[in-house]
Amino acid sequence: MLHEQSVELLNKAVADELTAVHQYMYFHFQCDDQGYDLLAGLFKRSAIDEMLHIERIAERILFLGGDVELLANATVKKIHDVKMMLA
């Protein structure tokens, strides 16, 4: 029972991380399109960092005998204003 609860919580963490990956990549695309190359790169790097977090969490889920669920828990916020992205 404890492992099942742990896997459930870890899968929620995976969902949060996936949501962050999607958001950071959306910001990356928007900044890249607007010519903010440095900021675009920072958002892309942040997305990659989140993917590495997912990898570590997934390893723990598998170690506990669980199944990794790759489902984001929120939709991407469609923000085009760079200042709002940083708020």
Model-derived features with residue positions:
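Iron-associated oxidoreductase/ferritin-like identity signal
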Residues: 1-87
